[in-house]
Amino acid sequence: MQNTIRIVGIDPGLRRTGWGIIETSGNSLRFVASGTVTSDGDMDLASRLCQLHDGLAEIVHSYKPDEAAVEQTFVNKDAVATLKLGQARGIAMLVPARAGLPVSEYAPNAVKKAVIGVGHGEKQQIHMMLKILMPKVEFKGNDAADALAIAICHAHNRGSNRMRQALAG
């Protein structure tokens, strides 16, 4: 009998950080919950990061995932925005790590490949595949959908991640 593993996927962002919780047992996936943690754009950066931290900490505390997956960020032309996104991503990695969860990271094209079969695709393709893979899925907005896709990517890759860690250790 396969163990059920609960995974939280996190799509970091300073304005909106998406989160999605799934359970995986063998090859089956089950939707648990999803949503978005927001920060107040009128507040200073430190306060906004605290809002993201507190919101994600509540999600991890409430849903008690076993593992976490966070999307890697990309560098864009706006260096200041990239740095702020990196800080939000730090919070997205810190919260589950402080809760004792192993945290894996995935590039955006790896997430798309795991969900839609190719490394480049549209948001609508991700939404459609989420509904096919988990018929009871519910998400409001792209951030929550992306977070669920990140969790699915981790579910597909977690065995190979464990193998790499064992070989490296």
UniProtKB/Swiss-Prot annotation:
An example Gene Ontology molecular-function term: DNA binding
Principal location: cytoplasm
Statement: the UniProt record of this protein carries the keyword Metal-binding: yes
InterPro entries in alphabetical order: RNaseH-like_sf (IPR012337), RNaseH_sf (IPR036397), X-over_junc_endoDNase_Mg_BS (IPR020563), X-over_junc_endoDNase_RuvC (IPR002176)
Co-factor binding details: Binds 2 Mg(2+) ion per subunit.
Binding residue positions for Mg(2+) 2: E71
Catalytic site positions: D11, E71, D143
CDD domains for the chain: RuvC
Function, as annotated: The RuvA-RuvB-RuvC complex processes Holliday junction (HJ) DNA during genetic recombination and DNA repair. Endonuclease that resolves HJ intermediates. Cleaves cruciform DNA by making single-stranded nicks across the HJ at symmetrical positions within the homologous arms, yielding a 5'-phosphate and a 3'-hydroxyl group; requires a central core of homology in the junction. The consensus cleavage sequence is 5'-(A/T)TT(C/G)-3'. Cleavage occurs on the 3'-side of the TT dinucleotide at the point of strand exchange.
Assembly notes: Homodimer which binds Holliday junction (HJ) DNA. The HJ becomes 2-fold symmetrical on binding to RuvC with unstacked arms; it has a different conformation from HJ DNA in complex with RuvA. In the full resolvosome a probable DNA-RuvA(4)-RuvB(12)-RuvC(2) complex forms which resolves the HJ.
Protein name, per record: Crossover junction endodeoxyribonuclease RuvC
Gene coding for it: ruvC
